């Protein structure tokens, strides 16, 4: 069935987005001096936190859709 494959692809995408945002957040927090191109570090940290939160919400939605699909079988 193609539906679960599409949802799994979306899940993989959102998981990668979360990982990228978490890595960016860690870089800002652990080495703010090395991020010279971003004068508004607080704004960048807030943006990264929002990106992590958004990705986690989408991951939960994908997981819920996969669970619903399993119950239909």
Name these PLM-found stretches.
Residues 2-73:
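Extended, charge-rich alpha-helical interface modules
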């Amino acid at each position: 069935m193609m539906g679960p494959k599409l949802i799994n692809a979306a899940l993989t995408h959102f998981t990668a987005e979360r990982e990228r945002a978490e890595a960016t957040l860690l870089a800002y927090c652990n080495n703010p001096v090395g991020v010279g191109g971003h004068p508004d570090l607080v704004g960048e940290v807030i943006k990264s936190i929002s990106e992590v939160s958004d990705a986690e919400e989408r991951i939960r939605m994908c997981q819920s859709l996969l669970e619903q699909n399993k119950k239909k079988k």
